[in-house]
Amino acid sequence: MALRYPMAVGLNKGHKVTKNVSKPRHSRRRRRLTKHTKFVRDMIREVCGFAPYERRAMELLKVSKDKRALKFIKKRVGTHIRAKRKREELSSVLAAMRKAAAKKD
């Protein structure tokens, strides 16, 4: 603890010391996407395409049935948070497809 104020009592009492800065734990980097993992996932997506439930969810998103799509995906993937993440992923894919189609024209 650093002696911020010259007082003998309280939180700031004691000797002046420098804080020992520790590296963040390795467990903190969990779920961070690496370049290799991203490359592999993109490759698999390109080869395999989308699952049938993902295609149906994309159709629901196309006709702006976002809530229905969320409920449908939640039923398939299990949890609300995973469903929201999947819906965001699919809507970003649709936006990219729209952008590519507009660029082509």
Curated annotation (Swiss-Prot):
GO terms for molecular function: structural constituent of ribosome. Keywords: Acetylation, Cytoplasm, Ribonucleoprotein, Ribosomal protein. The modification N6-acetyllysine is found at residue 62. Residues 13-31 have a biased composition (Basic residues). Transmembrane segments: none annotated. GO terms for cellular component: cytosol; ribonucleoprotein complex; ribosome. One of its GO terms (biological process) is translation. It is found in: Cytoplasm, Cytosol; Cytoplasm. Pfam families: Ribosomal_L36e (PF01158). Residues 9-31 are annotated as: Disordered. Belongs to the eukaryotic ribosomal protein eL36 family. Component of the large ribosomal subunit. The ribosome is a large ribonucleoprotein complex responsible for the synthesis of proteins in the cell. Component of the large ribosomal subunit. This is Large ribosomal subunit protein eL36. It comes from Oryctolagus cuniculus. The gene is RPL36.
